[in-house]
């Protein structure tokens, strides 16, 4: 890549769509596939997904979840056993009708989600209350044939995700499960991705098909749009009834199980890129960065040996605790290396020149803002640890400020539309519960109710609906969304 090719030419502030696409490609995260709606995930992009997966998978296993894998094809008859699934996903289902030249006796759906193939097996595995709770998860891809413009990680017909499925003896146990997973998603965004999230629940008309309650974590992007960052569904007994998940309780009485499902996709990577990156390229929080620290030696002919040796020793020491790269390439000058590692989002750069060697020191440069510090060589590990914590804190503080500055109240159709149109972000208003009131706003400005408060008993922010003026029963958060 040449110096000209290396730079980001689009502006995040003025042209966020083109800027985002340029960062994704030039930072080596993904390319566009020859088929519309699909992308090729490059090694650096997949490494981000693996880091995210490692965190989440570890937490799942700590709370009793076991990984499994189910076929990507689902018989049509299985989908039809849960009517809400059919109605909810039918327009987006990709169908396999032939095997080679032979027409199949029954169409096979390429999984849009896996409740319909996993739940029948849970029914086989559960016989007694002793088998509950049962918790399984799979990391896989799903296909939803949406007629939307391709936006890597945000909107693709095929995407990677995890989907968890559980069965429980009681509503209380299943609801606790639903909240546990939502809290883990929130933890992932806040502690690992440095993105504050807002948790809530979806309105009745926007729940997962067949769910009793859909909870969500929403993340606000710098362009004022909301991202549905992860969802956790309490499914009640609807799926258990459709697929005969019954168990014998302690009194030898047949009971119907309560089930949950929960999922997070690589849309999280889209949120990560959009939130933190800048006009120099990708910015990644240290916990997710494939390379956390890059050591760049800077030498002249008469100092090359000493500088390289010093830098290599320092990198080797740091590599025991951090993910470190030593960039001692001869064919690239320091300026090119700095720009390249900034483009790729390495959180911390360490510069080693003759002065650092002489002073037994190192210059540490933070990726988010270019702030630099000089650390003593003997305490370099502690200095790097502190610097990475500072980088995380800077990223979180910036994202938190964006969120706090973009939650507003509005009442009345004109004020809601005006606030959304001028500022974007979230607009809180009273809502009567009628989908038609949401439709008025959605038709006018393409904003929708992205969430309601988790606590159904929380008093509405206004006594009357912000759209129709009838009595309000909820606080609704309107936003434009990805």
Curated annotation (Swiss-Prot):
One GO cellular component term: cytoplasm
Cross-referenced CDD domains: ProRS_anticodon_zinc (cd00862), ProRS_core_arch_euk (cd00778)
Organism encoding this protein: Natronomonas pharaonis (strain ATCC 35678 / DSM 2160 / CIP 103997 / JCM 8858 / NBRC 14720 / NCIMB 2260 / Gabara) (Halobacterium pharaonis)
Lineage: Archaea, Methanobacteriati, Methanobacteriota, Stenosarchaea group, Halobacteria
Gene Ontology MF annotations: ATP binding; proline-tRNA ligase activity
Keywords noted in UniProt: Aminoacyl-tRNA synthetase, ATP-binding, Cytoplasm, Ligase, Nucleotide-binding, Protein biosynthesis
E.C. numbers: 6.1.1.15
Gene3D superfamilies: Anticodon-binding domain, Bira Bifunctional Protein, Domain 2, C-terminal domain of ProRS
Similarity comment text for this entry: Belongs to the class-II aminoacyl-tRNA synthetase family. ProS type 3 subfamily.
Quaternary structure and partners: Homodimer.
GO BP term (any one): prolyl-tRNA aminoacylation
Superkingdom per UniProt: Archaea
Subcellular localization(s) per the UniProt record: Cytoplasm
One Pfam family of this chain: ProRS-C_1
Protein name: Proline--tRNA ligase
UniProt function note: Catalyzes the attachment of proline to tRNA(Pro) in a two-step reaction: proline is first activated by ATP to form Pro-AMP and then transferred to the acceptor end of tRNA(Pro).
Class in the EC hierarchy, top level: ligase
Catalytic activity: tRNA(Pro) + L-proline + ATP = L-prolyl-tRNA(Pro) + AMP + diphosphate
Domain comment (free text): Consists of three domains: the N-terminal catalytic domain, the anticodon-binding domain and the C-terminal extension.
């Amino acid at each position: 890549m040449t110096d000209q090719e290396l730079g980001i030419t689009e502006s995040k502030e003025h042209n966020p769509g083109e800027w985002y696409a340029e960062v994704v490609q030039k930072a080596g995260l993904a390319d566009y596939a020859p088929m519309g709606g699909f992308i090729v995930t490059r090694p650096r992009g997949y490494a981000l997904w693996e880091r995210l997966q490692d965190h989440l998978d570890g937490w799942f296993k700590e709370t009793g979840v076991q990984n499994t894998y189910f076929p990507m094809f689902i018989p049509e008859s299985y989908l039809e056993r849960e009517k809400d699934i059919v109605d909810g996903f039918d327009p987006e289902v990709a169908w396999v009708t032939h095997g080679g030249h032979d027409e199949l006796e029954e169409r096979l759906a390429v999984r849009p989600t896996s409740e319909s193939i996993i739940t029948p097996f849970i029914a086989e595995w559960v016989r007694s209350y002793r088998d509950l709770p049962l918790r399984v998860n799979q990391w896989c891809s799903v296909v939803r044939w949406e007629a939307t413009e391709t936006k890597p990680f945000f909107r693709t017909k095929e995407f990677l995700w995890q989907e968890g499925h559980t069965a429980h003896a009681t509503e209380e146990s299943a609801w606790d499960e639903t909240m546990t997973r939502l809290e883990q998603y929130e933890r992932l965004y806040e502690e690992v991705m440095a993105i504050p999230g807002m948790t809530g629940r979806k309105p009745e008309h926007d729940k997962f098909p067949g769910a009793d309650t859909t909870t969500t974590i929403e993340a606000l992007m710098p362009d004022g749009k909301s991202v549905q960052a992860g969802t956790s569904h309490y499914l009640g007994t609807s799926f258990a009834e459709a697929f005969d998940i019954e168990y014998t309780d302690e009194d030898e009485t047949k009971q119907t199980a309560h089930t949950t499902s929960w999922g997070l996709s690589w849309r999280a990577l889209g949120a990560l890129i959009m939130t933190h990156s800048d006009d120099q390229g990708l910015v990644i929080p240290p916990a997710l960065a494939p390379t956390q620290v890059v050591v760049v030696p800077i030498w002249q002919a008469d100092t090359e040996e000493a500088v390289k040796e010093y830098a290599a020793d320092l990198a080797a020491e740091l590599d025991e605790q951090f993910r470190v790269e030593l960039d001692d390439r001869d064919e690239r000058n320091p300026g090119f290396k700095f720009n390249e590692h900034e483009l790729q989002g390495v959180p911390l750069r360490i510069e080693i020149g003759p002065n650092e060697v002489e002073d037994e020191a190192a210059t540490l440069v933070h990726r988010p803002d270019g702030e630099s510090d000089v650390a003593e060589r003997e305490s370099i590990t502690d200095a790097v640890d502190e610097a990475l914590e500072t980088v995380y804190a800077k990223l979180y503080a910036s994202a938190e400020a964006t969120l706090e500055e973009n939650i507003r109240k509005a009442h009345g159709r004109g004020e809601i539309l005006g606030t959304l149109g001028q500022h974007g972000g979230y607009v809180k208003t009273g809502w009567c519960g009628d989908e038609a009131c949401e439709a008025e706003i959605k038709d006018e400005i393409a904003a929708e109710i992205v969430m309601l408060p988790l606590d159904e008993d929380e008093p509405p922010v206004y006594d009357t609906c912000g759209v129709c003026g009838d009595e309000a029963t909820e606080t609704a958060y309107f936003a434009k969304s990805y």
